[in-house]
Amino acid sequence: MADWVREADEPISSDKVTSTIPIPARVRWYWPSRDRVLSLGAALLLSLPTAVYFWFYEGHASNQLFVWSVTLAFGAWLVLAFRRVLVASVLVNSLLGIVATMSWAKQQAMDMALHAYDLMFYLRSWGTIAFLWNGFRIHILALAAALLATAIAAVLAYRYDATRVNRRSALFAILMLTLAASVAAELKAERRHTQYYWDDLHISSFYSSWAETFEMLWRGQLIEAAASAPGPLFAIPSACETSTKPPHIILIHEESIVPPGYFPTLQYDHGIDRFFVSHDGKMHRLQVETYGGASWITEFSVMTGVSTQSFGGMRQFVQSLMAGKLHDTLPEALTRCGYRNVVFYPLERNFVSYDRFYASVGLKEVFDEKDQAAPTDNERDSFYFGNALDEIARHLRKSNKPLFTYILTMATHSPYDFTYMPEVDVPGGGPGTDPEMSEYLRRLAMAKIDYDELRHELARRFPTERFLIVHYGDHHPIATRTLLGFSTQLEAEDVSLPLDSLGFTTYYAVDGVNYRPPPQPEIETLDVPFLPVVILNAARLPLSDAFRERERLLAACKGRYFTCAPRDAILAFHRRLINSGLIDAH
C-alpha cells in the first residue's frame, strides 16, 4: 500500500523493514496495518450498494462514466477535507442514498425527479418549508432522521478511521476526476427531455441539474430578462368589456402534426393539404421549440405567451418549475371575458405534472382519460371530439357563458411501426416512402376526416352558436427525421437541430363555424409564444397591457420571439413582466 494511505511524515518502524538494503527516506512503501486494511475494506463495502445501483439504474456507458466521475470527485473533496477514506465513503454513500430516495419520493408525488433547484426553492422561505411540513411531514421526518444517522456515522468513522491521505494526492485526484467528469458530460450529450419525468436516472439527473442551477443563480432569475426596462407596469384589468357575446373557442393541440407539403420529395395524397389551411385560404407556419416529443414545451408557450428557450437549461421541465409563477395567461384572460374553460386530456391528469400546471394557469376543469372512459391513451381524434361536443351541448343547456374547449389529440403520436386502426381504408405514402412515414400519413388522413366531421357536427348540432376553431401542430413526428437527414436509428431526443431548422416548423390554422375571424398577421412564421395573442385577436377580445405589448412585439419582431432582432426588446418585455408581478422569476 502506498504513501497516500498514511501520514506523510509518519516514521517507519524497524520491524517493518525486512531487507538490509537501505531505503531512501522519501520511498516509504509498506504493507498497511490491520486497522488501515479494515478501514479501507469498510469503505469499499459501503460503496458496493452504490456500485450496484449505478450499474443497474444509471443508464448507458457514457452516463455511467459521468456519474462515477462526479461521485468520486465528490469523495476526493471529502478526502481533501478530512484526510480519511472511510469518512468520505460514509458521507458519499449515505448522501447518495438520501438523494436517490428523495428523488424517488418526489417523482411519486409530482411525477418529476429531484433537481438541484429544489433545494433552493423549497428552503428559501418559511412559506415553502411550511408547505413541505404540512404536505409531506413523514418524508421530512424521515429525511431528518437519515441526516442525523449520517452525521453520527461520519463522527464514528472519523474516530476509528485509520487511513490518512496526503492532501496533495487528494487534490491531484480531484483534478483528474473533474477532467473525467467534464469529458463524460460531453460524451453523454444533451439531457433527454424525458429524463426528469420517467427515465429514473435519479443521481445523474441530480448531478446534471447543478450546471443549470448555477446558470440561473448567475443570471439572478429563472428567466432571461434585462436588468431594467422603461415603460409602465403591466396592469391586469378587472373586467373584460365586449359589445357582443364572444364566440366559443375550440383550441386543438394536434399531436405530432406537420404539413407533409414541407417536404417536396414526399409522395402523398394532397387532399390532406386542405387540413392546414385557415379561413383566409392560407397556410400559416408556426415555429415551436421541441422536436419529436415533449409536447408540454409547446403547450407551455401556448398557455403563457413566453418562450421556453428563455429559461435556458431549465426549459425541459418548465411546466413543473413555473406552476403558480405566471399570471395573465391565455386561460385567465378568457376567464376575465366570461369564459368557462375545460380541457379534454388523453392521459391521466397528473402526467408530467399537467394537473398542477393547468390549475395554475386557469384551466380548472380537466377531463382526463379516466373521466372520458377512454379504452386506450391514443384514441382516434373523433373520440375526443365526440366527448367535447357532448360537453358543449351540456354547457349550452345550463349556461349562456362562452366556452373555451381545449382538446389534445393522440392518434398521430408515435410509434409508427404498426398499423393504427387497420380497418380504416385511408392512403399512406407513395411508392418508396419510408414505412414509418407512410403509417404517419395514414393517421394524418384520419385526423383530417375527424376534423372535417367536427366542423360538420358543430354546424349541425349548434346552428345558432358561433365557434372560433384554432388548431396547431405541437411538434414534428419522429417520422420526419429521415427527411431532415437523420438515421432511422435515432430517437427523438438524439436529433439535434438548430433553432431555425425546418424540424421546428409546424403550422397553425384559424377557422370558424358561423363565425368569420379577422385577418391573420402578415408574417412568414409565427413563433409559438405569440399564438395566444393571435387567438385573443381572432376572437375579437380586448387585450390586457401585457398582451397588447405582445401584439406590438409580434409586429416589431416579424413573428419571432426568442430570436427577435433586436433581442433587447424581448428581454425588456420579460423585465416588465417580472416588475409587474406577472412572472415570479425566483
Predicted regions and their residues:
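Generic structural signal for short, solvent-exposed loop/turn connectors between secondary structure elements
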Residues: 39-41, 55-69, 80-88, 229-247, ...
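Membrane-interface transmembrane-helix boundary segments in multi-pass integral membrane proteins
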Residues: 127-144, 208-218, 436-443
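A diffuse structural propensity rather than consistent per-protein peaks
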Residues: 108-116, 203, 368, 487, ...
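Transmembrane and membrane-interface helices of multi-pass
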Residues: 2-201
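Short hydrophobic/aromatic-rich motifs at helix boundaries and adjacent loops
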Residues: 46-49, 94-99, 124-125, 247, ...
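Solvent-exposed soluble domains appended to multi-pass membrane proteins
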Residues: 237-240, 251-254, 259-586
